[in-house]
Amino acid sequence: MAIAANKIAGIRAASCFDCFTAEMARRHNDANVLTLGARVTGAGLALKIIEQFLITSFDGGRHSRRVDMINAL
């Protein structure tokens, strides 16, 4: 799903499998869409990942250059 979503302008989708990857996707890549594997992620963990994704903000700074390059594609 993330691959398909990333074909849409302005979308920065990330497939996350734990809270750490969700946090880093937001902090470093300014991900704005979260995808989860239904067959490999239990309901309890999925809720924790979603919460972490929603409460985490983009760090900006040195990471902004990468996001700008992605947006320019």
Identify the residue ranges that each predicted region occupies.
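Short glycine/serine/threonine-rich phosphate/pyrophosphate-binding segments
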Residues: 1-4
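C-terminal binding/interaction regions
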Residues: 8, 13, 19-73
